């Protein structure tokens, strides 16, 4: 199987005002994200969204299409480790960062799962068949107090677990 094309379909969408306030502003407004598609000669297509739900992904589209796409065209999509090994060069010489590479990696794993007709977690060797739901958000606070308040609100909503995402300033506290 070989990669025949890589495209990004730009999706502009309105984020409704949910009333979630944060130190970083309110979560609402228009954002652009991309739907990354990696096509193969076998007719299998891998997908991944590009960009954060609030900040969008416009800044990631060109590096993916102009730097990573030429590296992948004609290659076997199972050669994920080959591209990981190229990241050092692509990072230092071409400015590729992990947030540019990550959607491509996810789409390649999506392809692998579809080609094997198996969920990705099984390809990775997982044996757990269920997991408890947890809450997570992009960083919404810059102070420890903000995170404590958010954790309390989530706990009162019934969540028992919370994936804490923070900025370096909040980590210092």
Where are these regions (language model features)?
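Structured beta-strand/loop patches that form or line metal/cofactor-binding pockets in enzymes
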Residues: 1-42, 47, 53
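Alpha/beta enzyme core
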Residues: 148-160
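Conserved small/polar residues in nucleotide/adenosyl-binding loops
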Residues: 166-171
């Amino acid at each position: 199987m070989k990669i025949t094309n890589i495209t990004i379909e730009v999706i502009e969408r309105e984020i409704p005002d949910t009333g979630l306030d944060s130190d970083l502003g309110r979560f609402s407004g228009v954002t652009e994200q991309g739907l990354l598609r990696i096509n193969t000669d076998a007719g299998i297509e891998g997908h991944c969204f590009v960009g954060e739900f609030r900040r969008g992904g416009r800044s990631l589209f060109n590096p993916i299409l102009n730097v990573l796409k030429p590296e992948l065209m004609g290659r076997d999509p199972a050669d994920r480790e080959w591209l990981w090994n190229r990241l050092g060069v692509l990072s230092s010489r071409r400015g590729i960062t992990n947030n540019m590479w990550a959607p491509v990696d996810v789409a390649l794993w999506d392809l692998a799962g579809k080609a094997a007709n198996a969920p990705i977690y099984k390809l990775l060797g997982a044996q757990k068949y269920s997991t408890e739901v947890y809450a997570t958000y992009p960083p919404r606070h810059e102070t420890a107090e903000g995170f404590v308040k958010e954790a309390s609100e989530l706990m009162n909503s019934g969540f028992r677990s919370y994936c804490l995402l923070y900025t370096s300033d909040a980590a210092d506290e």
